[in-house]
């Protein structure tokens, strides 16, 4: 027996009309590594970090009005990169209960040697929504004080760069011309630096 109710046809601009038909398919696990897992939902394959906390990028400007960047070699792309201080939230057993704000303070000091007086959440979004479930939070660090050398943990070899805020964009393009890989999120980070805080809101 057919229903007498008419079929519901959603307009093309309705959000639900653009959701793929297999978006609610069961999730299959294709591979589990130490840090990453490969999943499949319907026809879609994507990576998922094994730590559930996501990642955090720290927007840090020194009292001398210099933006903190970090340089390190990334094996996945076989290049030296320029990034902002960043790290995973709750990636180690002893940090399992931390949130993005705690992770931001820890990673800032670990990578750059600076400790901050306070932290401000700015924004959160996907790092690469077409291939990963990872979400990244941007956190602004305030009232920085130098307390150590930085350089990262024993598995990292990080070089810290302190760049005058007004020259940061130009400096990044110069590093790109030298062959460094520049994380595009840095330019979003510089925009957030200019548009967050009391000075930006005044």
Task: Please give the residue ranges for each predicted region.
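Nudix hydrolase/Nudix homology domain
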Residues: 7-13, 18-22, 80, 121, ...
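Acidic, metal-coordinating catalytic segment for phosphate/diphosphate chemistry
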Residues: 22-64, 72
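Acidic pyrophosphate-coordinating catalytic loop
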Residues: 29-34, 49, 75, 125-136
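Conserved hydrophobic/aromatic beta-strand scaffold that supports enzyme active sites
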Residues: 38-40, 59, 69, 138-140, ...
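Active-site-adjacent beta-strand/loop module that shapes the phosphate/pyrophosphate-binding cleft
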Residues: 39-40, 128-147
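Conserved Nudix-box catalytic region and its N-terminal flanking loop in Nudix hydrolases
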Residues: 49-53, 57-62, 66-106, 147-148, ...
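A short coil-to-beta-strand element that immediately follows conserved catalytic motifs
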Residues: 115-122
């Amino acid at each position: 027996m057919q229903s007498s109710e008419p079929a519901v046809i959603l307009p093309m601009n309705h959000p639900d009309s653009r959701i793929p038909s297999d978006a609610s398919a069961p999730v299959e696990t294709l591979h589990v590594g130490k840090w990453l897992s490969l999943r499949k939902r319907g026809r879609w394959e994507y990576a998922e970090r094994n730590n559930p906390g996501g990642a955090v990028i720290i927007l840090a400007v020194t009292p001398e009005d210099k933006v903190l960047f970090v340089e390190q070699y990334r094996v996945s792309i076989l290049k030296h990169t320029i990034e902002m201080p960043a790290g995973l939230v709750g990636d180690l057993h002893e940090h399992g209960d931390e949130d993005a704000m705690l992770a931001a303070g820890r990673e800032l000091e670990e990578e750059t040697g600076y400790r901050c007086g306070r932290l401000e959440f700015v924004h959160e979004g996907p790092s690469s929504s077409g291939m990963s479930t990872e979400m990244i939070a941007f956190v602004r660090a305030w009232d920085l004080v130098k307390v150590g050398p930085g350089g990262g943990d024993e598995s990292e070899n990080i070089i810290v760069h302190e760049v005058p805020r007004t020259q940061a964009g130009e400096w990044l393009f110069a590093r790109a011309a030298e062959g460094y890989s520049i994380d595009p999120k840095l330019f979003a980070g510089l925009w957030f630096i200019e548009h967050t805080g009391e000075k930006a809101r005044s």
